[in-house]
Amino acid sequence: MMNLTNKVAYITGGSKGIGLGVAKTLLDNGMRVAITSRHLSAAKEAAASLSSDESKVLALQSDVSSMQSEVDAIKAVTEHFGQLDVLVANAGVGHFASIESLTEQDWKDTIDTNLTGVFNSVKASIDALKQSKGYIITIASLAGTNFFENGSAYNASKFGLVGFSQAIMLDLRKYGVKVTTIMPGSVATYFNGHVPNDADAWKIQPEDVGQMITDLLQMHPRTLPSKIEVRPTIPGK
């Protein structure tokens, strides 16, 4: 069982949605967090909403599609906090169109962020996580096992992410590093231009994902839930 007090989590895409909800929950449970966004102003605004104490919250600019950007961000985390215990690979985008309408740039942006971006985050953080015997949480989607119309790019990225995550789980467990893939259904976030509102009350809330991660971190070291599907209890109409 991980004692969460003063442990450090690095959360990509942490300025809103699931990432921000996870950061808030981990912070409430005594952890320190580093959150990233492609835009530093967004990361700083989110960090300020969490805490004014820079010893607890660090805001960083990083583009997960760039390996060097992630290497620089992880270096900043370890220099600031002195350690890294948890990676939450959450940054993601969605482009939805029929194959006739899907552009090459939409395809590239989706794969570079949702799949290559996680590869970059893992590669950049793995040495620090081996040292701490830490935990990697990848945020996939039910779209990682269920395909749908106009979802070719998104499905490909999330199917790939599930496979990647399960493979590295086998690679890394011998070092004491755990890997879990969380596959949420409908979550009340700003994803794909949506603005959360009262009609989203039936959906999973970002803090629910944060609570799930907290529970995972506190499980006995001998126990490894490698893949978790989570849905709203009662789907909305």
Across the structure, where does each feature detected by a protein language model lie?
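Conserved glycine-rich cofactor-binding loop
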Residues: 8, 15-17
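C-terminal helical subdomain
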Residues: 177, 181-182, 189, 198-237
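Residue(s) in the substrate-gating loop at a strand-loop-helix junction
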Residues: 141
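Active-site helix of classical SDR
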Residues: 122, 157
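Substrate-binding pocket helix/loop in short-chain dehydrogenase/reductase
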Residues: 98-99, 106-108
